[in-house]
C-alpha cells in the first residue's frame, strides 16, 4: 500500500489513495491525527502542491513486515533535498493507518522560496496542522535505576532474524545508552547518515560521535523509549521518542521529540540511516525551536 503514496507524489494520482482510505482510517501529519475524507482530501491537495516545488521524488528505502509497510522518500530539486518517512498499516486492500514524519523545516524553506517576492516567513507552512495535545510525565531514569525498559527484542516481530535483532540492539544501545564505543562497530566512513537535511559523517560535517555528544549535551535528563520496530533482512524502521529537559531563555521545559529512523544495513554495518523529526510540529507544541 506504500505504492499509493508513491503514485500520489509521482503521478498526482489521488483516486488510488482515496479508494484505499476508509472513513475510519487515521492519517498522521504534523503530529496530528486526521480522520475522514474531508480532512484527508485536504492533506492530499497540500501534498500535490508541495510536489510541484520539487523536480524529483524517489523512494530511497523501504521495509515490510506483515501488514505494515514503510519507506523513506527523497524530494529533490537543484538546491534542496527533503526527506520524509511514511508508514502504512493495511488489511484486505484498505489502509487502516497512514503515518508521516516530515523534515518540515527543510520543506518550508524550499516551499517558501517559490512564493511571491516579499514572503519571508521561511520557517512556516500555512497549511501545517496544529499538533494534538500532549501530556508529558516527569519520569526520571536516575530515580528508577532498577526499572526494566523495552528493548528491540521486546517490540520487534518474532519472525525477525537474530542477525537483524542483534544489529538493531547494538544501534539502540548507541543512541539510547550513549554507547560511544559502539559507533565504530556499526558505522563506516561510507555510511550515509542524515538528521533531517543535515548530513553527518562526511567532510565538513559533524561525525556520528560528535552528533551523539551534542544530543546528550543539549537534552538533559534524556529518556529514550521505543514505540515500534519494523524490520527485514536489510532494512528497518524504528519509531522512537526522546523525553528530555530543554534549556530555553526562561529556564527548563520538558519536551518530547518523536523520531522516525529508517535504516539499511549489510554485513553487520549500517549503510544508510535517515532520521526525520518534524521541526514545525515541535515548535508549535513547545514554543521553542529544535535543539539541533
Report residues per predicted region:
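Short, aromatic-enriched amphipathic alpha-helices that serve as compact interaction elements
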Residues: 1-13, 20, 147-179
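A solvent-exposed, acidic/Ser-Thr-rich amphipathic alpha-helical stretch
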Residues: 14-68, 182-234
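Soluble or luminal CAZymes and related metallo-dependent hydrolases
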Residues: 1, 39, 163, 167, ...
Amino acid at each position: 500500500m506504500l505504492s499509493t503514496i508513491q503514485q500520489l507524489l509521482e503521478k498526482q494520482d489521488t483516486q488510488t489513495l482515496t479508494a484505499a482510505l476508509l472513513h475510519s482510517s487515521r492519517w498522521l501529519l504534523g503530529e496530528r491525527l486526521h480522520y475522514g475524507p474531508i480532512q484527508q482530501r485536504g492533506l492530499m491537495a497540500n501534498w500535490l502542491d508541495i510536489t510541484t516545488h520539487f523536480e524529483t521524488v524517489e523512494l530511497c528505502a523501504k521495509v515490510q513486515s506483515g501488514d505494515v509497510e514503510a519507506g523513506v522518500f527523497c524530494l529533490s530539486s537543484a538546491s534542496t533535498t527533503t526527506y520524509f518517512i511514511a508508514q502504512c498499516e493495511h488489511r484486505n486492500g484498505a489502509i487502516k493507518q497512514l503515518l508521516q514524519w516530515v523534515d518540515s523545516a527543510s520543506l518550508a524553506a524550499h516551499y517558501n522560496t517559490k512564493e511571491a517576492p516579499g514572503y519571508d516567513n521561511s520557517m512556516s507552512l500555512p497549511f501545517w496542522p496544529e499538533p494534538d495535545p500532549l501530556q508529558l510525565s516527569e519520569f526520571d531514569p536516575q530515580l528508577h535505576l532498577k526499572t526494566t525498559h523495552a528493548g528491540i527484542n521486546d517490540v520487534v516481530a518474532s519472525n525477525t532474524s537474530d542477525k537483524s535483532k542483534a544489529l538493531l540492539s547494538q544501534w539502540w544501545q548507541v543512541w539510547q545508552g550513549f554507547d560511544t564505543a559502539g559507533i565504530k562497530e556499526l558505522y563506516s566512513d561510507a555510511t550515509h547518515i542524515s538528521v533531517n537535511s543535515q548530513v553527518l559523517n562526511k567532510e565538513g560535517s559533524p561525525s556520528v560521535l560528535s552528533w551523539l555528544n551534542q544530543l546528550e549535551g543539549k537534552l538533559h535528563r534524556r529518556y529514550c523509549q521505543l514505540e515500534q520496530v519494523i524490520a527485514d533482512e536489510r532494512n528497518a524502521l524504528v519509531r522512537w521518542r526522546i523525553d528530555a529537559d530543554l534549556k530555553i531563555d526562561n529556564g527548563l521545559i520538558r519536551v518530547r521529540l518523536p523520531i522516525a529512523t529508517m535504516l539499511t544495513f549489510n554485513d553487520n554495518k549500517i549503510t544508510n540511516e535517515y532520521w526525520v523529526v518534524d521541526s514545525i510540529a515541535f515548535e508549535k507544541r513547545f514554543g521553542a525551536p529544535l535543539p539541533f
